[in-house]
């Protein structure tokens, strides 16, 4: 039906007769002439109808936005004064000789100026996806997956599919369950990841595996989370953690080079402990120059319990955050920041405004100045490298609250004061995570997942002091987003059972949930390691949007609903009966 795409016409096509298929993006009726911007997947081109082709001109008068049409015409160069530098096709236009209206469009539920609520965009997603910026994002996503496949093929990885209907295993979030008709009362789980299957593939001798795969997690959603999401899943045998990171870093550098024309360079490596200490986060945004600085040793003897208490507590921390130029912040702005950090458990926000450093105590403005002598103030200013016009914020509490609160404040202030270099790319690896973290109920939970290997520990050493164990795990972070994470896996049955035991999984439960894995570990399991990237998040970064729903064709809302299809929906009672399921209705309040 077509000979060319609208968005691909250039000066090289001048004089050629072309047939185009697409939609009316905009129509301008000048009486004797009608112009339309005609759109398809590749872009927009201007088409005009003149009186010399009366039939086509008459039919063109009926055109409205989003009519689906076919146009045949001749490509012409625009007059120099009419060239549109903002359009890829802006040097040419098409003089139409024939027009076919393939399908008309009703009045549109979306605003033609594209000022629409997200609810409307999701309900009429098929119209929203016609917008050039949305089409471009999905084309970029397709390019990314194509580049990934070629790279992985070139590096000896095999694309192997793993099951969608599998067994529920504890991986940190709730499972989506699928009832079995054949085995009434039993359920499959949709996979949160192919974790165990890819490990079993390594035990099967496939050496290098990858898969671009859907995963499912029934969890409370945030702006950058979806109940179903896509992973670039990778596993290798006989490779160390640095070797895995080297290959995966090469993949990501390749993507940025091909999609953005950007050389990311070598990725720095930072331990979890250093990231938390310097940036208050295990996914630091290195485009932001501000760092947290420990000052507890300077404040142990001050007569101000807010500082002295945490400074003398082994589990406490007092840290400072210097904000370049922050002395210009108003009292209201400071109060707003104080309220902001309360979200993260902080009780308040102490600060020092540095107006004239050379004057010592007289050169600062601070509500806590009365508790500090000149020597302490000078030491704080030295350690934070404060200059005239700077602001120093303080966090004083337990270590987690200080890291969370000042880490979040660092990001917010960086954006508010334009201190974060938005034009920069800042990738890094974060390694050496704690193996376990407190579950809040006196026990331990795996920081990554229970199949992660500890670093340089025997099973006996791990069992003796699990709270001090470091995991052989690594995350890739770009501009403050965790885009991928992985680890060296446990390849010893004894070690795996030890980890299960530390997590409070007794032997009976181990057999019930992981018997197949424990059995497989008995038969010559190779050392193996892997990683998974979030394709949605990678695409989000590479397309420059901050909304993950912009890079998924048919996403869910934050309530895990599809507004277009109205999923989830009630099931047919007959289908439920066949599955042996009764739906219990909530009692209405009297």
UniProtKB/Swiss-Prot annotation:
<dbReference type="InterPro" id="IPR002312">
    <property type="entry name" value="Asp/Asn-tRNA-synth_IIb"/>
</dbReference>
<dbReference type="InterPro" id="IPR004365">
    <property type="entry name" value="NA-bd_OB_tRNA"/>
</dbReference>
<feature type="binding site">
    <location>
        <position position="226"/>
    </location>
    <ligand>
        <name>ATP</name>
    </ligand>
</feature>
<feature type="binding site">
    <location>
        <position position="482"/>
    </location>
    <ligand>
        <name>ATP</name>
    </ligand>
</feature>
<comment type="similarity">
    <text>Belongs to the class-II aminoacyl-tRNA synthetase family. Type 1 subfamily.</text>
</comment>
<keyword id="KW-0436">Ligase</keyword>
<feature type="binding site">
    <location>
        <position position="489"/>
    </location>
    <ligand>
        <name>L-aspartate</name>
    </ligand>
</feature>
<keyword id="KW-0547">Nucleotide-binding</keyword>
<dbReference type="InterPro" id="IPR045864">
    <property type="entry name" value="aa-tRNA-synth_II/BPL/LPL"/>
</dbReference>
<protein>
    <recommendedName>
        <fullName>Aspartate--tRNA ligase</fullName>
        <ecNumber>6.1.1.12</ecNumber>
    </recommendedName>
</protein>
<dbReference type="GO" id="GO:0004815">
    <property type="term" value="F:aspartate-tRNA ligase activity"/>
</dbReference>
<dbReference type="InterPro" id="IPR029351">
    <property type="entry name" value="GAD_dom"/>
</dbReference>
<feature type="binding site">
    <location>
        <begin position="534"/>
        <end position="537"/>
    </location>
    <ligand>
        <name>ATP</name>
    </ligand>
</feature>
<dbReference type="InterPro" id="IPR004524">
    <property type="entry name" value="Asp-tRNA-ligase_1"/>
</dbReference>
<dbReference type="GO" id="GO:0003676">
    <property type="term" value="F:nucleic acid binding"/>
</dbReference>
<feature type="binding site">
    <location>
        <position position="217"/>
    </location>
    <ligand>
        <name>L-aspartate</name>
    </ligand>
</feature>
<dbReference type="GO" id="GO:0005737">
    <property type="term" value="C:cytoplasm"/>
</dbReference>
<dbReference type="InterPro" id="IPR004115">
    <property type="entry name" value="GAD-like_sf"/>
</dbReference>
<feature type="binding site">
    <location>
        <position position="448"/>
    </location>
    <ligand>
        <name>L-aspartate</name>
    </ligand>
</feature>
<keyword id="KW-0963">Cytoplasm</keyword>
<dbReference type="Pfam" id="PF02938">
    <property type="entry name" value="GAD"/>
</dbReference>
<feature type="binding site">
    <location>
        <begin position="217"/>
        <end position="219"/>
    </location>
    <ligand>
        <name>ATP</name>
    </ligand>
</feature>
<dbReference type="InterPro" id="IPR006195">
    <property type="entry name" value="aa-tRNA-synth_II"/>
</dbReference>
<dbReference type="Pfam" id="PF00152">
    <property type="entry name" value="tRNA-synt_2"/>
</dbReference>
<keyword id="KW-0648">Protein biosynthesis</keyword>
<dbReference type="GO" id="GO:0006422">
    <property type="term" value="P:aspartyl-tRNA aminoacylation"/>
</dbReference>
<dbReference type="InterPro" id="IPR047089">
    <property type="entry name" value="Asp-tRNA-ligase_1_N"/>
</dbReference>
<comment type="subunit">
    <text>Homodimer.</text>
</comment>
<feature type="binding site">
    <location>
        <position position="171"/>
    </location>
    <ligand>
        <name>L-aspartate</name>
    </ligand>
</feature>
<dbReference type="InterPro" id="IPR047090">
    <property type="entry name" value="AspRS_core"/>
</dbReference>
<feature type="region of interest" description="Aspartate">
    <location>
        <begin position="195"/>
        <end position="198"/>
    </location>
</feature>
<dbReference type="InterPro" id="IPR012340">
    <property type="entry name" value="NA-bd_OB-fold"/>
</dbReference>
<comment type="function">
    <text>Catalyzes the attachment of L-aspartate to tRNA(Asp) in a two-step reaction: L-aspartate is first activated by ATP to form Asp-AMP and then transferred to the acceptor end of tRNA(Asp).</text>
</comment>
<dbReference type="Pfam" id="PF01336">
    <property type="entry name" value="tRNA_anti-codon"/>
</dbReference>
<keyword id="KW-0067">ATP-binding</keyword>
<dbReference type="GO" id="GO:0005524">
    <property type="term" value="F:ATP binding"/>
</dbReference>
<keyword id="KW-0030">Aminoacyl-tRNA synthetase</keyword>
<dbReference type="InterPro" id="IPR004364">
    <property type="entry name" value="Aa-tRNA-synt_II"/>
</dbReference>
């Amino acid at each position: 039906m077509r000979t060319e795409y609208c968005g691909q016409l250039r000066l090289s096509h001048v004089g050629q007769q072309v047939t185009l298929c697409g939609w009316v993006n905009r129509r301008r009726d000048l009486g004797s002439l009608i112009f339309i911007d005609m759109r398809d997947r590749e872009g927009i081109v201007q088409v005009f109808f003149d009186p010399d082709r009366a039939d086509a001109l008459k039919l063109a008068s009926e055109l409205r936005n989003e009519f689906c049409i076919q146009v045949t015409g001749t490509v012409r160069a625009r007059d120099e004064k009419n060239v549109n530098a903002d359009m890829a096709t802006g040097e040419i236009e098409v003089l139409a000789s024939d027009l076919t209206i393939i399908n008309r469009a009703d009045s549109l539920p979306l605003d033609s100026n594209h000022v629409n609520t997200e609810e409307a965009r999701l309900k009429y997603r098929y119209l929203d996806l016609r917008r050039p910026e949305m089409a471009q994002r999905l084309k970029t996503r397709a390019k990314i997956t194509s580049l990934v496949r070629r790279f992985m093929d070139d590096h000896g990885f095999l694309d192997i599919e793993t099951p969608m209907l599998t067994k529920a295993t504890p991986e940190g979030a709730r499972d989506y369950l699928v009832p079995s008709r054949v085995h009434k009362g039993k359920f499959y789980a949709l996979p949160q990841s192919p974790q165990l299957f890819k490990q079993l593939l390594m035990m099967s001798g496939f050496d290098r595996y990858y898969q671009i795969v859907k995963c499912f997690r029934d969890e409370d959603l945030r702006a950058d989370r979806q109940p179903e999401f896509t992973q670039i899943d990778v596993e290798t045998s006989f490779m160390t953690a640095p070797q895995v990171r080297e290959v995966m870093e090469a993949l990501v550098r390749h993507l940025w080079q091909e999609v953005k024309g950007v050389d990311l360079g070598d990725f720095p490596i930072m331990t979890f402990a250093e990231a938390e200490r310097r940036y208050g986060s295990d996914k630091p945004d290195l485009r932001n120059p501000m760092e947290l600085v420990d000052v507890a040793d300077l404040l142990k003897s001050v007569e101000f319990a807010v500082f002295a208490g945490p400074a003398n507590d082994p589990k406490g921390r007092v840290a400072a955050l210097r904000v370049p130029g922050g002395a210009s912040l108003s009292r209201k702005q400071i109060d707003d920041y104080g309220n902001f950090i309360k979200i993260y458990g902080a009780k308040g926000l102490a600060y020092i405004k540095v107006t004239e450093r050379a004057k010592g105590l007289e050169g600062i403005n601070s509500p806590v100045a009365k508790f500090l002598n000149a020597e302490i103030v000078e030491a704080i200013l030295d350690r934070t490298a404060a200059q005239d016009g700077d602001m120093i914020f303080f966090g004083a509490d337990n270590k987690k609250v200080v890291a969370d609160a000042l880490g979040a404040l660092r990001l917010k202030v960086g954006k508010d004061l334009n201190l974060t270099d938005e034009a920069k790319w800042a990738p890094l690896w974060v390694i050496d995570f704690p193996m376990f973290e407190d579950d809040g109920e006196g026990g331990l939970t795996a920081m990554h997942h229970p199949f992660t290997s500890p670093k340089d520990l025997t099973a006996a050493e791990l069992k003796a002091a699990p709270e001090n164990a470091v995991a052989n795990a690594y995350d890739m972070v770009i501009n403050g987003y965790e885009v991928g994470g992985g680890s060296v896996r446990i390849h010893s049955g004894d070690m795996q059972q030890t980890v299960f035991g530390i997590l409070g999984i007794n032997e009976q439960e181990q057999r019930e949930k992981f018997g197949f894995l424990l059995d497989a570990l008995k038969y010559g399991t190779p050392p193996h390691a892997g990683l998974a990237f979030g394709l949605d998040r990678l695409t989000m970064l590479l397309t420059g949007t901050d909304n993950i729903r912009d890079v998924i064709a048919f996403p869910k809302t934050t309530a895990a609903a599809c507004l277009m299809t109205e999923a989830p929906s009630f099931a047919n009672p007959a289908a439920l009966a066949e599955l042996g399921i009764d739906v219990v209705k909530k009692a209405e309040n009297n």
